[in-house]
Amino acid sequence: MKNMLRDAAILFAITVIAGAVLGFVYDVTKEPIAQQEARAKQEACQEVFADASAFETVAEAGDASYGAILEAGYDKASIEEVMKAQSSAGDVLGYVMIVTSHDGYNGDIRFSMGIRMDGTLNGISLLAISETPGLGMRAEEVLKPQFAEKQASVFAYTKTGAASEDQIDAISGATITTNAVVEAVNAGLCYFQNVLEGGVEQ
């Protein structure tokens, strides 16, 4: 009986100490992690809107306005955040969106996209992707450049060579990845056309 009580006391002490250590580690690392995430987001915004001086969040995860893309049929994509891209004078140059496709071949594909007020897509910046090496992972080199400085209301991918502004050359052997990215970009464009141009307070 005495041994059982001793073992229980030792186990309790270990649990308390472990909990205290974990709590301490969390407190120590929480701020640096938050700062790192903030820097990563800033860099992602700056990459798709290089001439903007500031970014102001106008819609966060779970915002009711995101229902617009579901109504349009984009149920395999979600918008995590929408930010106004502003000049040094405070003028709104356009918007940056953080978008996630849930239709990748090997998981979610997350990226930022910047759109000017005239509807021009500055481009996209891939934030998270884990597709097949040599195939879907080529999205960075094959797909990303094709979205730069394009003006289209909706994109479509082709396997025979892009012949117009709204066509994107598919990654050879990775049409699932291609479709996932294209449809998620289209979801962002849909949100811009149906919600942002419709009067987000500027």
Regions found by a protein language model. Give the residues of each.
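Flexible, solvent-exposed loop/hinge segments and secondary-structure transition points
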Residues: K2-Q202
